[in-house]
Amino acid sequence: GPAPYQYQLVEDRGVERVAALGLESWPDLKFARYEIRMDGIDKPVAVAQVARRGAGAPIVLDWDNRTGEPLLFADMRLAELKSLSQAIAKHTSNDALLLGWWDTSRALQLLTGRETLFNAHLGEPFIAPPPWQRHRRSIVRYERDFWGAPPAEVEVRRFQRFAEALSLGAAAGAAQLRELAGDREAYVVVHVSDLYKLGLLHRERLGVAYKDFPVRGDLHGPISFVKRWMGDHHYAAYAVHELSDSQARAYFLADARSGNTLLAQMLPLSTSRPAELQAQQLVH
């Protein structure tokens, strides 16, 4: 059967709207906004800002999930990608290689022109609420049709190696990433939401949970909530990501072993010190 949702084009972005989003630096890109719609629900379940270059495949730059359930993509924020693109332009040479999760990689390749290890829409892990799990085959097919050609087998295998590297201890994981990058000048780009995605792929090495908290003013109020929640559930560490002015998402690690993974060591978790990581050097 069909997928339980559809992408509906709401708006092709004209020059004025592009200016409002602060995207004038990319005059060669075409921007559009899509709503993700389900039958019987009058509001969109998610909203995506999408860009493409010429006749290229569409690429997500912003994913705003309007439900409490994980849905297709982890939340992405255009503002974060823009500031990251500026940092990459400032700190890396034009022929540097970027290693990051496939969705981040595609967006950064589009915005920075740097080569990335992954260019295809890999769709891993499969992110869907429980009622959608039985539609997995039709969802995967619909996603492939919408986002472009299926990936080559070599890229799928390379991504599996990349995800595995992030789930290993810091030294072994960094060595595996170096092997993937070859002799190139290479930079690893990670986001706190990668914890959730990697946890779905490697549950045996990385136990992850998350909870959304309301924010009023600064993050100090929610942090005390988060610490209490962590203690009540016996989690080992946390990181907080601001989704909007009114909402923050706390990611929790289930145990100390999860905190020893390369990914956890590279992120600003309550138990990590990325600046002191011996296996890699923090740039931004």
Predicted feature descriptions by range:
Residues 1-284:
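Extracytoplasmic
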